Amino acid sequence: MADWVLHVDLDQFIAAVEVLRDPSLRGRPVVVGGNGDPTERAVVATASYEAREFGVRSGLPLRTAFKKLPDAVYLPVDHALYEAASADVMAVLRSFPVIVEVMGWDEAFVGVTVDDPAEFARSLQAAVLSATGLHCSVGIGDNKLRAKIATEFGKPAGVFELTQANWVEVMGHRPTSALWGIGTKTERKLVELGLSTVTDLATASADELAARFGPRMGPYFRGVAQGAGDTVVSATPWVAKSRSHEKTFQQDLASLDDIRREVVALAHQVALDVVAEGRPAVRVGVKVRFVPFFTKVRLMKLPAPTSSADELAAAALVVLERFEHGRAVRLLGVRAEFSDEDVEPKPSPSTYQ
């Protein structure tokens, strides 16, 4: 018997749930985002595989998606529906003698001790499909990093194993962006250092990486390229680190008074979540997306922890003054962050944080 980490990832989760609700959507390009109106300002939450064939992906502006694929079915986001479907899937996983660490609506790590992890993974897939009608891919690894990356090779609805034994063979020749946690910006910086592949990064000078990315992130990137990762799967309930609200405006805001008014309204919404959380906020952040699509975030530490809507709003206005004004605004957001100390566990997340 051996200890394994499995990464369970529901395939095109949101789109798949919408197809379960309306089977007539099966096989059609489905795009979910915002209020379902592709002429409004919002982004794609998810797209079915049929829509992805036309270049429609999560995070793409809905208007851009509509230009690429005007004949797709556009649907509004239904948080309650996806939350319920996710809970059903996690309940299936917990029915096995395993440890389940929920990572979001559509994914979880599973810790298990078995002789044949691939066979066990297929039994998980069958159980999830039978109980919920949803397909999932499963990555198998000797740590979380490898299991997470393995899932990408198993999509859709497949199983793939990635361990120390086959890490170099599978990953060595791939670009560094294939690694979990390395995005396109970091990839470009690595290329500037002559590090194009995973093997390049894994064998790079630790001192050189530390000089370019800092003493913490430099060695971290090198470790990721070597496949190093956490092996512990924890069932400890997820705890929110912050609460936030954002609003995208269909008409740009040009007046500073209008911007202030919206920030106060968002802060009051956030305060309701802070009170419900039962923990005071210690920091307040404001996010501003200027026209055409330039985003900045500012953050400040509060003089004292608070759950007061008025105090959070006042702090948000102070943060707002740290931005350079003069450009029209298309999106505003307010975030309240909690202290990491004396945290009381809460139920697992129902939305991405």
Locate the predicted segments by residue:
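DNA-contacting surface of Y-family translesion DNA polymerases
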Residues: 7, 178, 186, 191-331, ...
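A generic structural motif
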Residues: 107-112
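Short beta-strand
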Residues: 100-104, 138, 278-279
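Generic non-transmembrane alpha-helical segments
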Residues: 88, 92-96, 123-132, 189, ...
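Residues that scaffold, gate, or flank divalent-cation-dependent active/transport sites
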Residues: 1-105
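Long, highly charged, low-complexity intrinsically disordered interaction regions
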Residues: 114-177
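Short acidic, glycine/serine/threonine-rich loops at helix termini
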Residues: 17-19, 42-45, 146-154, 233-236, ...
